[in-house]
Amino acid sequence: MAYRIAFASSDGKVINQHFGRTQKFLIVEIDEEVAKYIETRENKPSCEEFQHTEDAMTRSISLISDCKAVFAAKIGRGAIAKLDEAGIKSYETPNFIEDIIDKLLTTKKTLF
């Protein structure tokens, strides 16, 4: 069964963005033994000047609502709670996107 994952990344290679400050999410679909790039979604960051608004947070989560998980370099506690409420697993790991995808494909694990 295929599922989508969002990665908070400035360059499409490394998970290097804070969830609340990322300007884009790279969307990848995982299906059995294949990972497929879907698109890059532009995001208006929900954190500005060390705080966030509920509307902006809701907008960011809505942008990735078709994803089962999001990977970011950092994710605040409030965002983790809101993502969980939306049914989106959150993972805080500054890593290479390709390494995460390879691990998912080789272990044949789902995140859910």
Identify the meaning behind each predicted range.
Residues 1-55, 59, 66, 93-112:
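Non-catalytic interface/targeting segments
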Residues 53, 59-89:
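Mid-chain, well-packed structural core segment of small domains
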